[in-house]
Amino acid sequence: MNLVNKAEKTFALTTPLYYVNDVPHIGSAYTTMAADAVARFQKLLGRDVLLITGTDEHGQKIQRSAESLGKAPQEFCDEIVPSFMSLWRLLNIQYDRFSRTTAVRHKAIVDEFFARVWEAGDIYQGQQKGWYCVSCEEFKEERELLEGNRCPIHVNKEVEWRDEQNYFFRLSKYQTQLEEFYQSHPDFIQPESRRNEVLNFVSQGLQDFSISRVNLDWGFPVPNDPKHTLYVWFDALLAYVTALLDPEDEPTLENALGKWWPINLHLIGKDILRFHAVYWPAMLLSAGLPLPDRVFGHGFLTKDGQKMGKSLGNTVDPVGLVQQYGSDAVRYYFLKEIEFGKDGDFNEVRFIHVLNADLANDLGNLLNRTLNMVKKYCANYALSITNEDIPAENTLKALGVDLGAKVKQAYEVLAFNQACGVVLSLVQASNKFIDDQAPWSLYKQERQQEVETVLYTVLESVRLAAYLLSPVIPNISSNIYQQLGFGINFNEQTDITPFAIHAQWGLLSNKQQLGQPQPIFKRIEQTKNV
């Protein structure tokens, strides 16, 4: 297969394909919000972006969940999948492809890929003995287990002993190739802590892994031995490839891999790191395909410092959270307050405090009061000042000049908290600047040029902040842009706002038709039960 060199102008990224044994939880929402922010940022840079999400629908866990409700597995999946799609709509996620592992065209891709790996001599039949976690859909090594034969991830679940004939993938064959790849591509696994985990795991010696199950009806049959069902992970990882097909394409690897492959970024939770950073690249090497650019494993979420779980009754309902506070609020808190890659905590009191402080007070009040001053102090509700009138040593201009480059660097390494933090520094400096300069006092002294200079400088800084935060808070950013006289909606993909222009300080012109001041984020009143 001749794969063309992927264009610099394209960027493909994936969330995990979420397991549909239940409705989506806040952890799934977290990964997807991050992916959407990356996708929106890449679009600002002028790239064609493909954001892939979807659902992993095969396996024993789903079969058992369906049986417990007296339903067929497909019926069960068909009822759960819409809850993911509706949550993504609520969160303002602009995904391009939703890949379901039960899709007919996915089976064609899986069968073709299996045939390639079979022809490479990397699949054989053997006896599988070991402890199996149904929730992980994975065999566990004895040294990994907790007391009472419990899974280290699903601590309330006992693993099951299995002894059965399975097909295996020769993972051990790729030990050296993988180690050499990790060495020559140090950014492949991120952050550094995850990379070290993988290097440590691989250095202990890779074992061949089972890619089929017997006594399991729910999944694709092994192409040359239908008594066996393909292991959920062998099938699920390939759904990233299936998602690359255009709707009218015949489902072949050649068609799928033509434009978007290799994937630029796989975003995952750290619990599925091994599958994406070890098994997946080895499978691709076996099939003779280029490897993805980057796998980023983020941390887990806790609530009020405690691990979340249904048994503890302390889960965070993402649907309820968005319905109560709005999508921008939820996106902002999780991306700004948690260092992506580390574990993070949700606390509703802190959540409300952060939103009120950053969005309602610092950003919202600043825009509102400044626009009202323009209305009060400037003829025809317009500024006569332009960027050329502002000296380079102006406090806010000096801060704004390099801000775009700093924020770009932060977004590119998925440091959303840093991107938000440096933008907020400009907003806070703008609040201090307007208080220090006191345009109301300058107006009384009839120093009109200075009044307008102060107001221009602050409004331009708010504009720049809105633009740079638009991947995180697109609704609020759109509202700000429209109040500043730009007919731009950051949710409309046809509205072109090139980074090279809009990330520069000084874009606001003296011809702007400023909009009416409106609150961009209403202060949240804290109820007693929070």
From Swiss-Prot:
It holds the Pfam family Anticodon_3. Monomer. GO terms for biological process: methionyl-tRNA aminoacylation. Zn(2+) binds at C133, C136, C151, H154. Keywords: Aminoacyl-tRNA synthetase, ATP-binding, Cytoplasm, Ligase, Metal-binding, Nucleotide-binding, Protein biosynthesis, Zinc. SUPFAM superfamilies: Anticodon-binding domain of a subclass of class I aminoacyl-tRNA synthetases, Nucleotidylyl transferase. Belongs to the class-I aminoacyl-tRNA synthetase family. MetG type 2A subfamily. Is required not only for elongation of protein synthesis but also for the initiation of all mRNA translation through initiator tRNA(fMet) aminoacylation. ATP binds at K310. One of its GO terms (molecular function) is ATP binding. It is found in: Cytoplasm. Its cofactor is Zn(2+). Binds 1 zinc ion per subunit. One of its GO terms (cellular component) is cytoplasm. The keyword Membrane does not apply. This is Methionine--tRNA ligase. It catalyses: tRNA(Met) + L-methionine + ATP = L-methionyl-tRNA(Met) + AMP + diphosphate. Its EC number is 6.1.1.10. It comes from the Bacteria. A motif ('KMSKS' region) lies at residues 307-311. It comes from Nostoc sp. (strain PCC 7120 / SAG 25.82 / UTEX 2576). The keyword Nucleotide-binding applies. InterPro entries: Anticodon_Met (IPR041872), Met-tRNA_synth (IPR014758), Met-tRNA_synth_2 (IPR023457), Methionyl/Leucyl_tRNA_Synth (IPR015413), MetRS_core (IPR033911), Rossmann-like_a/b/a_fold (IPR014729), tRNAsynth_Ia_anticodon-bd (IPR009080). A motif ('HIGH' region) lies at residues 18-28. PANTHER family: METHIONINE--TRNA LIGASE, MITOCHONDRIAL (PTHR43326:SF1), METHIONYL-TRNA SYNTHETASE (PTHR43326). Gene3D superfamilies: 2.170.220.10, HUPs, Isoleucyl-tRNA Synthetase, Domain 1.
